[in-house]
Amino acid sequence: MKYHDLRDFLALLEQQGELKRITLPVDPYLEMTEIADRTLRAGGPALLFENPKGHTMPVLCNLFGTPKRVAMGMGQEDISALREVGKLLAFLKEPEPPRGFRDLFDKLPQFKQVLNMPTKRLRNAPCQEKVWQGDEVDLNRIPIMQCWPDDAAPLITWGLTVTRGPHKERQNLGIYRQQLIGKNKLIMRWLSHRGGALDFQEWCQAHPGERFPVAVALGADPATILGAVTPVPDTLSEYAFAGLLRGTKTEVVKCLSNDLEIPASAEIVLEGYIEPGEMAPEGPYGDHTGYYNEIDNFPVFTVTHVTQRENAIYHSTYTGRPPDEPAVLGVALNEVLVPILQKQFPEIVDFYLPPEGCSYRLAVVTMRKQYAGHAKRVMMGVWSFLRQFMYTKFVIVCDDDINARDWNDVIWAITTRMDPARDTVMVENTPIDYLDFASPVSGLGSKMGLDATNKWPGETQREWGTPIKKDPNVTARIDAIWDELAIFHDGKGA
């Protein structure tokens, strides 16, 4: 599925009935959230609010409101094809040279995709068609949504933040929410382990007291946005990965006020800096947990330039108790994660992050168990392999006869194959999501692993239970006469 920028993608969505234009006046204050939430829960289309109250700039919501649209953004037709994206990432994370001529041909598609990795630098770009700078900058021109009644202020949610550390050649792209606190001021809420925060820390050490350049792209093409939330290898830039997804090189242009490179087709770009030591209290905000988060101090982003396309579109979303857009995104990205994990742990059959678990706080793993203690090795591997699982509080490991995505199966395994004392692993004083108020200390808490596998010799001294299995001959005989029995007139139960 080929597209060049966000507008191309919206045209594709509209052709397929996946985009709804809203012409009635709708307020960015609470009303857009209510409409977007109802639409997402019904599996509805992306929404383009063409007449936001008090503004002339349209607002795009629910862009990734179904797994299908996430897959389309990654250049695929449906969610099942995302396993191939995961296989490509697994290959790039640990590339293997071809083992002979036939293997070379098998790997040719992957090598061809790599040709789309380098960025294409432009001198002039659509994102700089209109420019405001200095006193002309007024972020109130943008219809920034306020999503929940007790939110502190309007909040930018889909800002693609571009940074570069002082000792790094490649840039970091990350999605960090930003609270509006003035006509040219935002609070940059990034956690200390995230790429942007690490770049800032390194900058402050290398250039004490100097301003840290930052750019925020709003309304980038979907491949670039998704590249920023996908577990790409550290050696691969998000722009390069976006080129792989899109099938064409990512076009970038240099900022007007600094040397950062931004997506050339972005709808809006905010350029500016963070002054070391300038902090402000952020929040509270309703978040993907379903609760308002605590207030905490984060750096202030001062905007010196706003550039945009003609007739720019503002891309936004809301976060709340699942299902919300991040939860849907998590369902789709789950398919990308499976091949990456299987590359490192071939015994893993499936891996599932239930959306009701905030998309990352609980994981279910099914595996082909091969020895006593194997399940514990896998759960430790899940916690340590990808930083995306740093905040996963619960890991449930089951055998491969269990469907990881069926709670009936998983709960049966937990209640019949686990002894709580023997099969529960507790790990204390580990990194925990700052938004997790259940932990005793902010950012530090415990994790639990549940070994719900059948136990092997060495793990139990008792004879293990034998699962009940039907007689296949009897099943076949009853299948043959089932309709004749007419127990269910509507065919139910067959």
From Swiss-Prot:
Binds 1 prenylated FMN per subunit. It is an enzyme of class 4 (lyase). Its cofactor is prenylated FMN; Mn(2+). The keyword Cell membrane applies. Mn(2+) binds at N172, E238. Prenylated FMN binds at I175, Y176, R177, R189, W190, L191, R194, G195. Its main location: membrane. GO terms for molecular function: 3-octaprenyl-4-hydroxybenzoate carboxy-lyase activity; metal ion binding. It is a peripheral membrane protein. It is found in: Cell membrane. Transmembrane segments: none annotated. GO terms for biological process: ubiquinone biosynthetic process. The active site is at D287. Its EC number is 4.1.1.98. Catalyzes the decarboxylation of 3-octaprenyl-4-hydroxy benzoate to 2-octaprenylphenol, an intermediate step in ubiquinone biosynthesis. Homohexamer. This is 3-octaprenyl-4-hydroxybenzoate carboxy-lyase. It comes from Cronobacter sakazakii (strain ATCC BAA-894). The lineage of its organism: Bacteria, Pseudomonadati, Pseudomonadota, Gammaproteobacteria, Enterobacterales. The gene is ubiD.
